């Protein structure tokens, strides 16, 4: 099987390098991210997928897009907001839709969360939160859930897309915790789960160890990474 490389920058920021050498960036937030390695930067990207508008998921989208020239894929309202910040290459889409970027098929899935930005003391709605299923060149599919609670239609994500790897939030408080994430793993039918969105802030108390205790008896691999680490 061709190599897939995953680099984690802490929180929910990942660079996934596909078997064909494409770099998919998810939710880039480096500046002010207490878990990001010192001096971390993302200077190569083929596509940037942004799940929702909260600053801990959008903080470096504009910087990375300008540095790399990569298009930004997001729900329509969020893509329009990025355009208002000067980005020219955006792909606005919506739930259930699929687009193709540089040979990668990207489908937008629902998430149960919220999405907004605070500017000049005012909160601006930025469309619904989302997740993504990306079909790689070798046919494998990965599911990046974004920030979400557990929801029953994860079963439909399994039925429609059959992802092999899921990136799931486990920190609790703002998203699901390990117990709900374990049920998500079962509903999705994935072979491997990459925990994210934990330990960044005191409120995010869910841990990878708690998730491992719940899903390893299912035969599911839990990929626990250190910020800045790349796993294949």
PLM regions with names:
Residues 59-117:
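Glycine/small-residue-rich loop that forms an oxyanion/phosphate-binding "nest" at active or ligand-binding sites
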Residues 15-54, 59-66, 77, 114-125, ...:
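Pre-active-site segment of Zn-dependent metallo-hydrolases
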Residues 118-187:
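Active-site-proximal loop/helix segments of hydrolase catalytic cores
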Residues 25-28, 45-53, 73-76, 142-148, ...:
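Active-site neighborhood of phospho(di)ester-bond hydrolases with catalytic His/Asp-centered motifs
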Residues 1-23, 30-33, 210-218, 227-230:
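Zn-dependent metallo-beta-lactamase
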Residues 1-4, 17-24, 98-106, 135-142, ...:
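Beta-strand-turn-beta hairpins that frame and shape the catalytic cleft
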Residues 71, 83-98, 182-232:
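Binuclear metal-ion centers of metallo-dependent hydrolases, dominated by the metallo-beta-lactamase
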Residues 32-33, 54-59, 79-82, 97-100, ...:
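Active-site environment of divalent metal-dependent phosphoester hydrolases
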């Amino acid at each position: 099987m061709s190599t897939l490389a995953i680099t984690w920058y802490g929180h929910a920021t990942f660079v996934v390098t596909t078997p064909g050498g494409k770099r998919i960036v998810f939710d880039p937030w480096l500046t002010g991210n207490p878990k990001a390695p010192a001096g971390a930067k993302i200077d190569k990207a083929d596509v940037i997928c942004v799940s929702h508008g909260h600053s801990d998921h959008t903080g470096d989208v504009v910087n990375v897009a300008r540095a790399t020239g990569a298009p930004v894929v997001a729900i329509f309202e969020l893509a329009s907001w990025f355009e208002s910040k000067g980005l020219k290459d955006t792909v606005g889409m919506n739930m259930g839709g699929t687009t193709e970027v540089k040979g990668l098929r990207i489908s937008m899935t629902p998430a149960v969360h919220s999405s907004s930005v605070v500017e000049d003391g005012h909160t601006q709605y930025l469309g619904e939160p989302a997740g993504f299923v990306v079909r790689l060149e070798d046919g494998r599919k990965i599911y990046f859930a974004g920030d979400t609670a557990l929801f029953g239609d994860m079963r439909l994500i399994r039925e429609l897309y059959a992802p092999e790897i899921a990136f799931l939030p486990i920190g609790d408080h703002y998203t699901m915790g390990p117990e709900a994430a374990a049920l998500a793993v079962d509903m999705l039918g994935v072979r491997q789960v990459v925990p994210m969105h934990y330990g960044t802030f005191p409120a995010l108390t869910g841990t990878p160890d708690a998730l491992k205790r719940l899903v390893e008896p299912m035969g599911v691999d839990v990929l626990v990474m250190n910020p800045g680490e790349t796993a294949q």
